[in-house]
Amino acid sequence: MKILSIHDLATIRKRAEHNLSLREESNEKVTEKCYGLASGAQHLQILICGGTGCKASSSQGITDNLLKAIKKNEITDKVEVITVGCFGFCEKGPIVKIIPDNTFYTQVTPEDAEEIINEHIIGGRRIERLLYVDPKTEHTVSDSKHMDFYRKQLRIALRNCGFIDPENIEEYIAREGYFALADCLLNKKPTDVIDIIKRSGLRGRGGGGFPTGLKWEFANKQQSDVKYVVCNADEGDPGAFMDRSIMEGDPHSIVEAMCVCGYSIGSTKGLVYIRAEYPLAINRLKTAIIQAREYGLLGDHILGTDFSFDIEIRYGAGAFVCGEETALIHSMEGKRGEPTLKPPFPAESGYLGKPTNVNNVETLANIPIILTKGADWFATIGTERSKGTKVFALAGKINNVGLIEVPMGTTLREVIYEIGGGIKGGKKFKAVQTGGPSGGCLTEKHLDTPIDFDNLLSAGSMMGSGGMLVMDEDDCMVSVARFYLDFTVEESCGKCTPCRIGNKRLLELLNKITEGKGTEKDLDTLATLGQVIKDTALCGLGQTSPNPVLSTLDNFYDEYMEHVRDKTCRSKQCKSLLTYTISPERCIGCHLCAKNCPADAISGLVRKPHVIAPDKCIKCGMCMARCKFNAILVC
C-alpha cells in the first residue's frame, strides 16, 4: 500500500497497533502471574532475540522448534512466534520472552522449545531452570523489570530493539514510526527541523560529540544542485556492537532519520556506508529500504509532497580509519580510505565534491523520537553539555556483558557494579577502557565520574562510539596498551608520518618493555613521542591512537616500572618476564612434563623431582597444562 497522506499513515498505525497491543500492555505492568492457555490466556506471543549474538547461539533453531511444537499441538491460531532485535543482555542469550506475562527466559537452547510450549504456553507454568538467577540474592527473577541490568537503563536509541519485528514496517509505524517525517514534510520548514535538533542538545554519538543540529545547519546553508546524506555504519572498534544492533533491531528508524535529514539540508540522496562483514544488519537494512519504497516513504513525492528521497547501501572492507568521515567518503568514491585535512569540511565539499552530511547510526536513531516528543523532553535528560542517553557495549571481566543505554551523567560505578553486576569471579576491579582504541584506561579513582563527553575527556579518556571494556587484577596494563596500539598500527592508512612511523616506534617500545628489555628512559620516550603524535597526526585515528599508552602511563606508572626495573609482570601476562619452576614437594617424577616440553628444557629421573633449565625454557606453558599435580610454579 502506498502511503499518500498522514491519514493513510494513521490508518496503518491503527491496524498495526492491535498486533502490538499485547506487548505494549505487558510492557507497562509488572506481574508475578504466569499466563498459559490452561489458565485462560486467549493469545500469547513469544519474542525471540534475532540479533547476531543470539543467532550465533542457535536462536533460529529455537524458532524452528517452537513453530514445530505449536503446529504439533494445533495452537497456531493462539500463539505467535516473533523475531525481534537485541534485548541487550547478551551474557544470557539466547533470550526468549513470553507475552503477556513478560517471562524472561535466558540461555535457551533449541532443545528447550518443546518444554516451553508444553509447560508455559499450554500449562501456564514457568520453567524455573530457564529463569535469570540474581547473583546477589540467588533467587530467580522472571521479569526483566526486576533485573539490575535493566533497572537504571533508559532506552531511547534502543527503544524498539527487542520489542518490534525489525522486518515489519507496520510494527514500526505502530510505534509512531514515520510520523516525525510526516510532521516535518507537512508542517515544518527545513530550518524549523534544524532548530528543534539544535535545541535538543543532541551531539554526535560517533566519537567527536559535535552538535548534530549545527552540523545540519552548515549543510543546509550550502548552495548546491546536489547534496548527500551519509549514514556512517562503519563501526570498527574491537568489542563494539552498538550501531550494528540498532540496524539489526530497528532499521526503519535509520531510514526515517535519513529522510528527515535530507529534507532539512535539501538533499534527495542518502547513502549508508556499512562494512560487508555485517550481513544481518545489511539484510535488515535492505528489507527496510525496500518496504519504505513499497509504502511510498522513500522515492518520489513522499506523502504526496514535492520532497523526493532515496537511499543506497555502499559496502566497506572493514578499515577502521574509514570511520573518519573524509576517509569514509573517499572509500565510497572508490578511492583509498585516507582522511584529508579540514577545511573544507564534508558539509562544504564531501561526496563527489558536493555538500555532504555524515552522521553515525546511533545519532540518527535519536532523531525521530526527538521530533516526536520534542526538544525540551530530550534536553531534560543527561547533563548540562551532554543531553540524552548513550549506548555502550559492555564487555570484558564483568558479570553482565551486553548492550546498555543509560542517561548521560550516569557514573562508571553504576554502570560497572549495578548494571554490569560487578567483576567476574569476585576479583578486584582494575581499570575500564572507554572509547575503544582511541580512548584511555580509567581507574578506581574515576569510578564516580559521571559519564559524558566532557568528563571523560577531563579524566584522560573519551566517549568514542561507546565501547566499554572492564579489566580486573589479572590484566597487565602494559599488555593492554600494546594490544590497542597493535590494532591502531595495523589500521593506520599510512598517509601521515606521525601515525605511520610514530605509532610503530611506540609499539616497538612496548614490545621491548614486555619482553624484559625496556629501560626507564623508554618510559620517558613513550610519553614524549605519544604527545607528539597527538599534536601532529592528520586525523582523529592518529591523534587519539597514543591515548591507551598515555593513560596507562599516567595511571599505572608503577606497573611500567616493574616491567623495566624489576623485569616482572605482576599479572603474569608477559611471557618473557615469567620464570617457570617445578615444586620438588609436589612433583612425583611422572615425566609427563618432560615428554611434552617442545624445548627439552625439563630433566629428571622417573619418580624423582624434575627441574626446568631456565636458559632452554621458551615459556610456552605446555608443562603447566600437562601437569596433574599443580607442580609447575610461575613467578
Q: Model features per residue range: what roles?
A:
Residues 70, 257-259, 409-424:
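Short amphipathic, charge-patterned alpha-helical segments
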Residues 50-58, 197-219, 318-330, 336, ...:
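Conserved phosphate/anionic-ligand binding catalytic regions in large, soluble enzymes, centered on
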Residues 182-223, 378-380, 385, 393, ...:
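Accessory "access/gating" subregions that flank catalytic or transport cores
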Residues 92-96, 498-504, 592-609, 622-635:
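Iron-sulfur cluster-binding cysteine motifs and their immediate structural context
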